[in-house]
């Protein structure tokens, strides 16, 4: 027997390279022929003529040898191609007879095969996807729920099926989308399947929409599947169902739990409706993984925007996830979600930042901005608290900033409070309070108050030190006579009081402050920053940047509000950066918010970017998030600022700011700010920050009304790419960030859902896994949005690890959006990503969107193509097209499978015919050569009619 192991894909690639090389050599020979085969004599004498003839003869001999070499090269390439085809045909023919008996035994005894992908649930039935093989195989996608029926107590959409579980090596299947309801409640999306050891959890299915203009509620999105125990990304939660009229938007599904090193899945976005659906909670991180980011709250057209989902809790040694931003509303913006808490034994990992409050109101009716979410708390012993989220913009009142999280009990600084939102017509939002530090650490700075033309918001209270550390600065009051917040008192042993701290009644404490002021004076004079202490806040009306923290420790100060001043850098050794000031209000030109300050070298969180200013023309651009601490240990990036709103008729909403980058070794990258809701067009979401060595990229910010979400940040060397931001209403989702060299790709953002007569945007594309990642998956594509006409297309799944991606599976394509009328079609499913070059199963194509409701039989969206597997992996299943009439659905799937089988059979027959022609060609050539030898020897011979037989490359498959 043969002991040769052949990879048909590698042989085919080698044949292609050789053919290209032969073409290049032939072109070079042809170009040189004229100058080497017919040389002109240098003179008219006989010697020159003889020399020219001699060299010309050498050139002609070379061309003759080149022609023979070219013929041999063509034969070799042909033999290599036919050999690869023969290996592929033999491999395909041998798989079924060898594997089928084994799989039948396991199916009969366990209900799932040993090797192979699980079957997809039939569309329109809500059937669960089949489980993948015990050893290798992806779980099947759950079937979509059936549409509701007219009249009576009916009208509710059917629930989508759950995705199948993955095998030991394989991804969990995506949950099916909930059915569209004619009235009542849309069907719930199915839960994504769980991976076992190596693989990504399946994405949760999107909730079904509601067609009726009055009453009802969109279906809840399904929960994302859990990641594999060792490697793989957790599944993202499904988006809540979109509704028309006065119906309520569905809640987003929770993200799946991470594996050993994986981050928890991102929560699904809430559905749009009269009241926006709440964003799903981020999934819990694995043992060393960070918690997932909470989902974006849904848009509301006549009530409250959806509340952002809470960030997931970090694993035992992981950081907390960031809270989701609140949904925009025409009345009152939704509150941002709370940041997740870090793991109990996390060494320095920070709590997650609170989500940004949603914008609320209109120019004529007023409205209230949503409150920022609270920052998450650090671990039990070490770590800083998360920053509070900024309050949302309100056409009447601005939203209140979220409070900062508390630090670990031994070491760490309190989180900074979020800035209050701008109130256009009445009052600015109050700044959030700073968090409490550990025994060693600075109190968090209070957030700046929001600006207003009538009454500015008060600044937030600074956190109080415990043993060694400065008190936090009180936040500056907002423009419009806002009062500064009260500063925090320093630690008992060492530290300076924060800005605007109350006068001490203790003589010992007063002596301590005076001594430190004397010590700091020469450092302040020579370097512009103290030795110990916080930087000074920018005075309102001066436009000054916030001062830098002390050389040893101290927080950077907040930038001057209303001028877009930058926050000060944190203390050189440890300390948090200050928040950037918001941009100027009521200006015709753009007014950019200030950038957040950088954190300390060793420990420190970057400050949050300021909100862009309000403009009568073009809205201000949101300030960039503060850079993470340039640290050898820990430093989290700040959250990007929100884009400024535009109140002019032809105004343009500002884009959200970019999140700050994480520290060199550890720390969470900042989330991009969300785009402004006001203005046409509205602002796009900001991009997430890039991760550090072991950190994941930050999530992209949500887009403003009808605007696209921001792209996720790229992961660090071992980090996962960030999740793309969700598009709002008709906007496209942002693309997921690429994984680091050894990391997984980020998940694409979900597209927003459209209203009556609107086509929605497509889901974001998943990020690619890192070049050398072992077992990492490409990110899943985002789901397309639902619409009354044509649903948005699902995003393409990211590719698995490129070079040595051991069992790196490509991401599953996103689900197409569901059309809510009977006259149009659902969105096309996204294509599955490719597996790793050597090892790895390919991603399954996304299911096409639902094509009709109970009123008729619309056309389902086309299913996405499955991805290409690696040399030792399984190819991805194509997504089925969704239609509502049962007989059409069954006939379509049968035709699809039959067409695939017929294509394989035709390819094998072409390969067999090509091999036969090659054998006839070789026999004919041998007979011609034998005839020539006999003719030279003077012996008669017959050719038996072999002339003219040839085997050209065109005969080969």
From Swiss-Prot:
Transmembrane segments: none annotated. One of its GO terms (cellular component) is cell outer membrane. Residues 893-925 have a biased composition (Basic residues). Induction: Specifically expressed under low phosphate concentrations. Expression is very low and undetectable under classical growth conditions but long-term exposure to low phosphate triggers its expression. Administration of free phosphate, cardiolipin and phosphatidylinositol to phosphate-starved culture turns off expression of the gene. Pfam families: PE. The keyword Secreted applies. It comes from the Bacteria. A cleavage of the protein removes the N-terminal 120-150 residues, immediately upstream the PGRS domain. The exact position of the cleavage site could not be identified. It is found in: Cell outer membrane; Secreted; Secreted, Cell wall; Cell surface. Residues 4-94 form the PE domain. Keywords: Cell outer membrane, Cell wall, Membrane, Repeat, Secreted, Virulence. InterPro entries: PE-PGRS_N (IPR000084). Residues 893-957 are annotated as: Disordered. Its main location: membrane. The keyword Membrane applies. Gene3D superfamilies: HP0062-like domain (1.10.287.850). Expression in M.smegmatis enhances adhesion of M.smegmatis to murine macrophages and human alveolar epithelial cells and improves bacterial persistence in spleen tissue following infection in mice. Overexpression in M.tuberculosis improves adhesion to pneumocytes, but not to phagocytic cells. The 77 amino acids long, arginine-rich C-terminal domain plays a critical role in tuberculosis pathogenesis. This positively charged helical domain specifically binds phosphorylated phosphatidylinositols and cardiolipin, whereas it is unable to bind other phospholipids. The arginine-rich C-terminal region protrudes from the mycobacterial membrane and mediates M.tuberculosis entry into host epithelial cells. May serve as a bridge between mycobacteria and host cells by interacting with specific host phospholipids and extracting them from host cells, for their direct integration or as a source of phosphate, during phases of TB pathogenesis when M.tuberculosis is short of phosphate supply. Belongs to the mycobacterial PE family. PGRS subfamily. This is PE-PGRS family protein PE_PGRS3.
